[in-house]
Protein backbone atom coordinates (compact mmCIF):
# COMPACT_ATOMS: atom_id res chain seq x y z
CA UNK A 1 0.00 0.00 0.00
CA UNK A 2 1.06 3.61 -0.49
CA UNK A 3 0.44 6.40 1.98
CA UNK A 4 -0.41 9.73 0.36
CA UNK A 5 -0.65 12.06 3.37
CA UNK A 6 1.97 12.78 6.02
CA UNK A 7 0.24 14.07 9.15
CA UNK A 8 3.28 14.75 11.35
CA UNK A 9 6.08 17.04 10.12
CA UNK A 10 8.25 19.77 11.62
CA UNK A 11 9.99 22.93 10.45
CA UNK A 12 12.89 24.78 12.05
CA UNK A 13 10.27 26.67 14.09
CA UNK A 14 10.10 23.64 16.40
CA UNK A 15 13.56 24.53 17.69
CA UNK A 16 15.23 21.21 16.90
CA UNK A 17 14.25 20.68 13.25
CA UNK A 18 16.17 21.93 10.26
CA UNK A 19 13.99 22.80 7.27
CA UNK A 20 11.51 25.46 6.20
CA UNK A 21 7.97 24.72 5.13
CA UNK A 22 8.97 25.57 1.55
CA UNK A 23 11.77 23.01 1.70
CA UNK A 24 9.36 20.46 3.15
CA UNK A 25 6.85 21.13 0.38
CA UNK A 26 9.52 20.87 -2.31
CA UNK A 27 10.68 17.53 -0.87
CA UNK A 28 7.07 16.31 -0.83
CA UNK A 29 6.57 17.37 -4.44
CA UNK A 30 9.71 15.56 -5.53
CA UNK A 31 8.43 12.43 -3.80
CA UNK A 32 4.97 12.73 -5.34
CA UNK A 33 3.30 13.24 -1.96
CA UNK A 34 0.13 15.26 -2.59
CA UNK A 35 -0.54 16.51 0.96
CA UNK A 36 1.09 16.95 4.36
CA UNK A 37 0.29 18.52 7.71
CA UNK A 38 2.75 21.00 9.16
CA UNK A 39 2.77 20.27 12.89
CA UNK A 40 5.40 22.16 14.81
CA UNK A 41 5.71 21.67 18.55
CA UNK A 42 3.53 23.81 20.80
CA UNK A 43 5.07 26.27 23.21
CA UNK A 44 5.78 24.09 26.27
CA UNK A 45 8.44 22.19 24.34
CA UNK A 46 11.88 23.83 24.75
CA UNK A 47 12.62 25.95 21.69
CA UNK A 48 9.06 25.86 20.37
CA UNK A 49 7.20 28.97 19.16
CA UNK A 50 4.64 31.16 20.92
CA UNK A 51 1.03 30.26 20.20
CA UNK A 52 0.73 33.25 17.86
CA UNK A 53 2.81 31.22 15.41
CA UNK A 54 -0.10 28.80 15.05
CA UNK A 55 -2.76 31.51 14.85
CA UNK A 56 -0.87 33.11 11.99
CA UNK A 57 -0.77 29.98 9.83
CA UNK A 58 -3.70 31.57 8.01
CA UNK A 59 -1.07 33.42 5.94
CA UNK A 60 0.25 30.13 4.53
CA UNK A 61 -0.80 29.26 0.98
CA UNK A 62 -2.99 26.18 0.76
CA UNK A 63 -0.64 24.79 -1.89
CA UNK A 64 3.14 25.12 -2.03
CA UNK A 65 4.93 23.48 -4.97
CA UNK A 66 1.50 21.99 -5.81
CA UNK A 67 1.42 20.14 -2.47
CA UNK A 68 -1.61 20.66 -0.20
CA UNK A 69 -0.64 22.18 3.16
CA UNK A 70 -2.74 21.28 6.18
CA UNK A 71 -2.32 23.75 9.06
CA UNK A 72 -1.57 21.92 12.26
CA UNK A 73 0.25 21.61 15.56
CA UNK A 74 1.78 18.92 17.73
CA UNK A 75 0.43 19.92 21.13
CA UNK A 76 1.99 18.67 24.34
CA UNK A 77 -0.06 16.69 26.83
CA UNK A 78 0.44 18.34 30.21
CA UNK A 79 -0.90 18.30 33.76
CA UNK A 80 -3.60 15.64 34.00
CA UNK A 81 -4.61 15.65 30.35
CA UNK A 82 -4.66 19.20 29.06
CA UNK A 83 -2.93 20.50 25.94
CA UNK A 84 -0.69 23.54 25.78
CA UNK A 85 -2.47 25.60 23.15
CA UNK A 86 -5.16 28.08 24.19
CA UNK A 87 -8.70 27.34 22.97
CA UNK A 88 -8.51 30.53 20.90
CA UNK A 89 -6.01 28.75 18.62
CA UNK A 90 -8.37 25.90 17.74
CA UNK A 91 -10.24 27.74 14.99
CA UNK A 92 -6.98 28.55 13.19
CA UNK A 93 -5.92 24.92 12.84
CA UNK A 94 -7.08 22.06 10.65
CA UNK A 95 -5.27 19.28 12.54
CA UNK A 96 -4.02 18.83 16.10
CA UNK A 97 -1.87 15.97 17.39
CA UNK A 98 -1.51 15.47 21.15
CA UNK A 99 1.70 13.78 22.32
CA UNK A 100 3.63 13.01 25.47
CA UNK A 101 7.13 14.53 25.58
CA UNK A 102 9.49 13.94 28.50
CA UNK A 103 10.58 17.61 28.89
CA UNK A 104 6.93 18.61 29.37
CA UNK A 105 5.31 15.59 31.02
CA UNK A 106 7.76 13.52 33.09
CA UNK A 107 7.11 9.80 32.80
CA UNK A 108 4.80 8.50 35.53
CA UNK A 109 2.81 5.27 35.68
CA UNK A 110 0.40 3.53 33.35
CA UNK A 111 -2.71 4.67 35.22
CA UNK A 112 -1.71 8.35 35.13
CA UNK A 113 -0.84 8.15 31.43
CA UNK A 114 -4.08 6.31 30.64
CA UNK A 115 -6.21 8.86 32.48
CA UNK A 116 -4.43 11.76 30.75
CA UNK A 117 -4.90 10.25 27.29
CA UNK A 118 -8.58 9.58 27.88
CA UNK A 119 -9.11 13.13 29.14
CA UNK A 120 -7.37 14.52 26.05
CA UNK A 121 -9.55 12.41 23.75
CA UNK A 122 -12.75 13.47 25.50
CA UNK A 123 -11.80 17.15 25.28
CA UNK A 124 -12.64 16.98 21.56
CA UNK A 125 -9.74 19.35 20.88
CA UNK A 126 -7.37 16.86 19.24
CA UNK A 127 -7.57 14.80 16.07
CA UNK A 128 -4.83 12.27 16.77
CA UNK A 129 -2.57 10.86 19.48
CA UNK A 130 1.11 10.98 18.54
CA UNK A 131 3.84 8.33 18.86
CA UNK A 132 2.10 6.22 21.49
CA UNK A 133 4.69 3.46 21.26
CA UNK A 134 7.11 5.26 23.57
CA UNK A 135 7.75 2.81 26.45
CA UNK A 136 8.35 5.72 28.83
CA UNK A 137 4.62 6.41 28.62
CA UNK A 138 2.99 3.04 29.11
CA UNK A 139 -0.81 3.03 29.12
CA UNK A 140 -3.80 0.71 28.94
CA UNK A 141 -3.93 0.04 25.20
CA UNK A 142 -7.47 -1.33 25.21
CA UNK A 143 -9.00 1.46 27.30
CA UNK A 144 -7.38 4.33 25.43
CA UNK A 145 -7.88 2.94 21.93
CA UNK A 146 -11.51 2.05 22.66
CA UNK A 147 -12.05 5.65 23.77
CA UNK A 148 -10.28 6.94 20.65
CA UNK A 149 -12.51 4.76 18.46
CA UNK A 150 -15.61 6.09 20.22
CA UNK A 151 -14.58 9.73 19.75
CA UNK A 152 -13.06 9.33 16.26
CA UNK A 153 -9.56 10.31 17.33
CA UNK A 154 -6.87 8.71 15.17
CA UNK A 155 -3.99 6.64 16.54
CA UNK A 156 -0.70 7.65 14.95
CA UNK A 157 1.69 5.10 13.47
CA UNK A 158 5.00 6.96 13.64
CA UNK A 159 7.70 6.02 11.14
CA UNK A 160 10.48 7.54 13.26
CA UNK A 161 9.48 5.39 16.25
CA UNK A 162 9.51 2.31 14.03
CA UNK A 163 13.09 2.97 12.93
CA UNK A 164 14.20 2.09 16.45
CA UNK A 165 16.68 4.97 16.73
CA UNK A 166 14.58 7.20 18.99
CA UNK A 167 12.00 6.38 21.66
CA UNK A 168 13.90 3.11 21.99
CA UNK A 169 11.64 0.14 22.66
CA UNK A 170 8.76 1.44 20.57
CA UNK A 171 8.75 -1.07 17.71
CA UNK A 172 6.99 -4.02 19.34
CA UNK A 173 4.64 -1.67 21.15
CA UNK A 174 3.70 0.05 17.88
CA UNK A 175 2.78 -3.32 16.40
CA UNK A 176 0.69 -4.20 19.44
CA UNK A 177 -1.04 -0.80 19.43
CA UNK A 178 -1.87 -1.23 15.73
CA UNK A 179 -3.29 -4.71 16.37
CA UNK A 180 -5.51 -3.36 19.15
CA UNK A 181 -6.63 -0.51 16.88
CA UNK A 182 -7.53 -3.05 14.19
CA UNK A 183 -9.48 -5.18 16.67
CA UNK A 184 -11.40 -2.21 18.09
CA UNK A 185 -12.10 -0.51 14.76
CA UNK A 186 -10.09 2.63 15.49
CA UNK A 187 -8.78 4.94 12.81
CA UNK A 188 -5.04 5.26 12.34
CA UNK A 189 -2.98 8.03 10.83
CA UNK A 190 0.61 7.98 9.64
CA UNK A 191 3.37 10.43 10.49
CA UNK A 192 6.95 10.56 9.32
CA UNK A 193 7.71 12.87 12.27
CA UNK A 194 10.21 14.46 9.89
CA UNK A 195 12.58 16.97 11.45
CA UNK A 196 14.43 17.39 8.13
CA UNK A 197 12.88 17.78 4.71
CA UNK A 198 14.39 14.62 3.24
CA UNK A 199 12.29 12.53 5.65
CA UNK A 200 8.95 14.01 4.58
CA UNK A 201 6.61 11.29 3.32
CA UNK A 202 9.02 8.44 4.06
CA UNK A 203 6.89 5.58 5.37
CA UNK A 204 8.71 2.33 4.68
CA UNK A 205 8.40 1.12 8.28
CA UNK A 206 4.76 2.15 8.69
CA UNK A 207 3.76 0.64 5.36
CA UNK A 208 5.46 -2.61 6.38
CA UNK A 209 3.53 -2.64 9.66
CA UNK A 210 0.22 -2.04 7.89
CA UNK A 211 0.96 -4.87 5.45
CA UNK A 212 2.23 -7.21 8.17
CA UNK A 213 -0.97 -7.07 10.21
CA UNK A 214 -3.32 -6.59 7.23
CA UNK A 215 -4.72 -3.37 8.67
CA UNK A 216 -7.93 -2.36 6.83
CA UNK A 217 -7.19 0.50 4.45
CA UNK A 218 -10.57 2.12 5.02
CA UNK A 219 -9.36 2.87 8.55
CA UNK A 220 -6.01 4.33 7.40
CA UNK A 221 -7.02 7.97 7.03
CA UNK A 222 -3.84 8.85 5.11
CA UNK A 223 -4.30 6.29 2.34
CA UNK A 224 -5.60 9.10 0.10
CA UNK A 225 -6.18 12.85 0.51
CA UNK A 226 -9.91 12.22 0.18
CA UNK A 227 -9.89 9.75 3.07
CA UNK A 228 -8.02 12.29 5.18
CA UNK A 229 -10.44 15.10 4.35
CA UNK A 230 -13.39 12.78 4.98
CA UNK A 231 -11.94 12.10 8.43
CA UNK A 232 -11.67 15.83 9.15
CA UNK A 233 -15.34 16.14 8.20
CA UNK A 234 -16.19 13.23 10.50
CA UNK A 235 -14.38 15.11 13.25
CA UNK A 236 -16.68 18.08 12.61
CA UNK A 237 -14.11 20.31 10.96
CA UNK A 238 -15.29 22.75 8.31
CA UNK A 239 -14.50 21.88 4.68
CA UNK A 240 -11.38 23.54 3.27
CA UNK A 241 -12.55 25.27 0.10
CA UNK A 242 -9.19 25.11 -1.65
CA UNK A 243 -9.06 21.31 -1.20
CA UNK A 244 -12.37 20.55 -2.93
CA UNK A 245 -10.55 19.29 -6.02
CA UNK A 246 -8.89 16.63 -3.85
CA UNK A 247 -12.24 15.11 -2.88
CA UNK A 248 -12.24 12.65 -5.77
UniProtKB/Swiss-Prot annotation:
The cofactor binding remark recorded in the entry reads: Binds 3 Zn(2+) ions per subunit.
Could you name the Gene Ontology cellular component terms for this entry? cytosol
List, in alphabetical order, the GO biological process terms annotated in this UniProt record.
Answer: bacterial-type flagellum-dependent swarming motility
- The question of whether Transmembrane helix is a record keyword is answered with no
Q: Where do the annotations place Zn(2+) 2 binding?
A: 16, 41, 195
List UniProt keywords, sorted A-Z: Hydrolase, Metal-binding, Zinc
Q: What are the required cofactors?
A: Zn(2+)
Binding of Zn(2+) 1, residues = 8, 10, 74, 193
Give the EC number(s) under which this enzyme is classified. 3.1.3.-
- Output the Pfam families linked to this UniProt entry: PHP, PHP_C
Per UniProt, where does Zn(2+) 3 bind? Answer: 74, 101, 131
Domain of life per record: Bacteria
Coiled coil stretches, renumbered? none
GO MF, one annotated term: phosphatase activity
Q: Does the keyword Transcription apply?
A: no
UniProt record similarity statement: Belongs to the PHP family.
Which NCBIfam families does its entry note? PRK09248.1
This chain belongs to which protein, by name?
A: Probable phosphatase VF_A0774
Organism encoding this protein: Aliivibrio fischeri (strain ATCC 700601 / ES114)
Amino acid sequence: MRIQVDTHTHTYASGHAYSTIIENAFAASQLGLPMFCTTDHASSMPGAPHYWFFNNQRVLPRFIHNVAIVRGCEANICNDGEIDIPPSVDSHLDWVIASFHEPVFPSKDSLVHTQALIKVIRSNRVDALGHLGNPNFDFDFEAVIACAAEYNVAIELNNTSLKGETRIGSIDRCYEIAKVAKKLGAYVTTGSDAHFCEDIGKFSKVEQLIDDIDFPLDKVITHTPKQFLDFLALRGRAPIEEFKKLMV
